[in-house]
Amino acid sequence: MNILLATASFVLSLGFVKAEPTRHHDRYAYIERVVCDVNFPDLLCRRKSHAIAYRMFRLIPVRNPNYEISTDYVSHEFNTTRVRSESEKYLCSSYGPNGYVSGDVFILRNALNKLFDHHEIEELAYELFIRLVASFLDSCSYPKSFEHNLVRCRSEDEELCTSPLAAFIKLVSRRSTRDVVLIVLNDFSHYLKLEEGHGFSKDRKSNQCVKFTQLYFYYLSAAVNFIERKISAFTLIPVMDDRRIASVSAIMISSKFANTTGNYVINATSFMDNTIPF
């Protein structure tokens, strides 16, 4: 009898072990710096320049290495405060398992313009905030009703229709969404600390990538810190510490949300709020 019980226990344990995910769960999303050569068409000749962008990835699937992303590359020459023409905007898309191309373009184009136009940190901060969150939401799976609300805050050319400040107030007014916002900001802030002084810029003479200016990282870091202070003041709660981030991530990312293709998706049902348009 004891032998049978031991055998049954062993078989069950094998089953549970087999059911465990076979890979370590990374943070649900991360931002990657992209540096590339871009050809800008001209009336007389074709010029090549370097472009820098940030793009947000979803979790790399367990069995399918594809992902959804849409990235907008923009020239960032320091004597240029605005994108010179629409021909200098290039779109690079990767298709996800279902063939869907992300509708959101994450490049912080307006934020970069504000930075080089010497706009106030507050204005940059809200713009950065809403594009970070919109990019995160667009890189994961969430209910169609929330997708409808999200699309309504952007126009066809991806410009924001809703005030970034209004979107900020809506997102931080709900606990579940606020936690996600703080995680996104924490990730981006950590990324900036790691990358400070290691970014790239174009050297005009050699046309080679050189270290990016410290001022860029200073402005973005200051913008993130500003938003975190606003959240703390708005909600009367401290910014999330590592333990709380880990616990929220563990709730949001779970093997039970894995679909048939092996993609880990975000449990975003708590985002649904049909009473207030986004």
Curated annotation (Swiss-Prot):
Primary residence: other
Glycosylation sites: 79, 259, 267
First and last residue of the signal peptide: 1-19
GO CC field: spore wall
Localization per Swiss-Prot or TrEMBL: Spore wall
Domain of life where this protein originates: Eukaryota
GO biological process: one example: sporulation resulting in formation of a cellular spore
Protein name: Spore wall protein 30
Organism from which the protein derives: Nosema bombycis (strain CQ1 / CVCC 102059) (Microsporidian parasite)
Lineage of origin: Eukaryota, Fungi, Fungi incertae sedis, Microsporidia, Nosematidae
